[in-house]
């Protein structure tokens, strides 16, 4: 926990099992960064949260095409993607090779993030809108929003993240896995 204002840190406390000098993953904190980036696009009037995802990502699969961007941000989309780590055939396990968390099955083609997200379908005879008043947590939602940020801005998530980290004044290394579109991956090679 860190409490600060501008360049001043007023309080800093670490859990016993996460000492200050130990690298730690930021996992879902990535979602916070993506929301900050969307906020900047919103402030610049570059994004309309009431538009359907397919407006920004024309090739996106039926699992997101007709969802409003706001609903994806709110984890308020019902589709065939599942993120239940207790289920052996959860979609999330198929998503892991995209980011390099697992090796693809022998003979499988390695998909880009965008290619994988384009395969997510809607549930049969189901509207994408969640009417249950419960959030449906899915990392794929954040990945879809990340692609939208890249498409609108023409800049990779790497670019966005570096800007945010430098503005925050982080002193030490930040290790983060960003799943790039093919265009963004090409940017890294140049």
Regions found by a protein language model. Name each.
Residues 9-11, 86-130, 155-174:
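Short, charged, amphipathic alpha-helices and their helix-cap/turn boundaries
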Residues 43-85, 124, 140, 152-182:
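Active-site helix/loop module of the DD-peptidase/beta-lactamase fold
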Residues 180-190:
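Single conserved hydrophobic/aromatic residue that forms the stacking wall/gate
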């Amino acid at each position: 926990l860190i409490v600060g204002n501008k360049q001043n840190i007023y309080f800093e406390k670490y859990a016993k099992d996460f000492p200050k000098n130990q690298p730690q993953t930021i996992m879902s904190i990535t979602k916070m960064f993506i929301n900050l980036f969307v906020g900047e696009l919103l402030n610049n009037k570059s994004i309309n949260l009431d538009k359907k995802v397919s407006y920004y990502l024309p090739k996106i699969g039926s699992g997101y095409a007709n969802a409003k961007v706001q609903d994806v941000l709110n984890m308020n989309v019902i589709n065939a993607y599942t993120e239940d780590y207790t289920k052996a055939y959860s979609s999330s396990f198929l998503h892991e090779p995209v980011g390099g968390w697992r090796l693809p099955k022998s003979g499988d083609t390695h998909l880009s993030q965008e290619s994988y997200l384009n395969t997510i379908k809607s549930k049969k005879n189901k509207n994408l809108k969640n009417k249950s008043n419960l959030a449906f947590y899915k990392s794929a939602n954040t990945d879809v929003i990340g692609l939208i940020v890249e498409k609108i801005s023409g800049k990779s998530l790497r670019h966005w993240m570096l800007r945010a980290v430098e503005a925050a004044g982080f002193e030490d290394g930040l290790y983060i896995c960003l799943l790039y579109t093919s265009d963004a991956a090409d940017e890294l090679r140049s």
